[in-house]
Amino acid sequence: MKHRKSVSLLLAGATTVAMLTGPVQAAEAPSPQELAAARLQSEGLMKGDENGELHLEDDLTRAELACLISPIILNPEHVAWETDWYTRMCTTNFNDVPEWAQVAVGVCTSMGTMAGYGDGLFGPSDPVSPQMACTVMLRYLEQDGWTYDTACEKAAELGLAPAGSLEGDALARGDMAILLTGSLDYLAYLQTL
């Protein structure tokens, strides 16, 4: 009997300690943005900064968008052979694109997926709006039946990204990762038809 009381007291004490210390925190599950970015990284499409950080919460710029999508718009091996041509395509038309983005901007503008503002301006540091990103992806997918104002609705309708990730004035890098993976999945689906 004495042994039973000791065990009961020990269990009661352990239960009390467990209740006071709280539940063990489970590892946080990756967000949809992190999952999409990890996929793009594994496919060599998304790269981080010099420290490997992706800055998924930061607004995407037009130059970053061009760098992100140029490898899917045109075969990277072809671009490697024609780097000088795509650089000239950019520098002939735009006077504000940094060197690191010139080839990608040249690819995107030559393929008609992106355009500048006129007067030699591309606006490489300008934030990408959700409408702009959806417009680029819908052009890439050669979709019709939409306008710039309805591009986000069309992208959501096609399942490229949830409508909630296509809101606001500027698109975060993580939300672009979702849109890009959705577009790649949609393209793969179209190729099965």
Spans of features found by a protein language model:
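Extracellular, beta-strand-rich glycan-interacting domains
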Residues: 180-182
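Histidine- and acidic-residue-rich, metal-dependent catalytic cores
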Residues: 108
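Feature responds to low-complexity, polar/acidic, surface-exposed segments characteristic
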Residues: 2-36, 42-43, 47-66, 70-103, ...
